[in-house]
């Protein structure tokens, strides 16, 4: 499970997820990527479920890159606790993902395998997604 080793502050503001992602909108490492079409918080459990779905489908072939990390804690008050008395205790970790961000990339497998693996991963995530290829986005080419 992805969690930060150390954080400066345990409790952080929720913030707003407005607009598009500033960077990470193209396929940089692999040949195919999974791009978010909505903005949403993605928990470390959802990231792990998507990673497992991709790696199980690809079996031993190919490589997976996870381009998001859950660095933001979210808090929750216990069940039956009255309002007030400060902010709740940290309950989990999330990665704030804005629209347009490429979350996962795969490489070293055929197009059919990559698209199906990313489709299975997309089912585990709370955002609408699109599968991109390096050629569609105009990413760097691997030809010398």
UniProtKB/Swiss-Prot annotation:
Keywords: Ribonucleoprotein, Ribosomal protein, RNA-binding, rRNA-binding, tRNA-binding. Pfam families: Ribosomal_L16 (PF00252). CDD domains: Ribosomal_L16_L10e. It comes from the Bacteria. GO terms for molecular function: rRNA binding; structural constituent of ribosome; tRNA binding. Signal peptide: none annotated. Coiled coil: none annotated. GO terms for biological process: translation. GO terms for cellular component: cytosolic large ribosomal subunit. PANTHER family: 50S/60S RIBOSOMAL PROTEIN L16, LARGE RIBOSOMAL SUBUNIT PROTEIN UL16M. HAMAP family: Ribosomal_uL16 (MF_01342). Part of the 50S ribosomal subunit. Binds 23S rRNA and is also seen to make contacts with the A and possibly P site tRNAs. Belongs to the universal ribosomal protein uL16 family. This is Large ribosomal subunit protein uL16. It comes from Levilactobacillus brevis (strain ATCC 367 / BCRC 12310 / CIP 105137 / JCM 1170 / LMG 11437 / NCIMB 947 / NCTC 947). The lineage of its organism: Bacteria, Bacillati, Bacillota, Bacilli, Lactobacillales. The gene is rplP.
């Amino acid at each position: 499970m992805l969690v930060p080793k150390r954080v400066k502050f345990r409790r952080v503001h929720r913030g707003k997820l407005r607009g598009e992602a500033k960077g990470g909108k193209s396929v940089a490492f692999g040949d195919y990527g999974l791009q978010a079409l909505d903005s949403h918080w993605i928990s470390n459990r959802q990231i792990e479920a998507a990673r497992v779905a991709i790696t199980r489908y690809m079996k031993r072939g190919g490589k997976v890159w996870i381009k998001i990390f859950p660095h933001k804690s979210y808090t929750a008050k216990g069940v039956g606790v009255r309002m007030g008395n400060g902010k709740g205790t940290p309950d989990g970790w999330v990665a704030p993902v804005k629209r347009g961000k490429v979350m996962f990339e795969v490489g070293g497998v055929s197009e059919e395998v990559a698209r199906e693996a990313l489709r299975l991963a997309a089912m585990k995530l709370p955002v609408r997604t699109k599968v991109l290829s390096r050629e569609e986005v105009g990413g760097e080419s691997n030809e010398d």
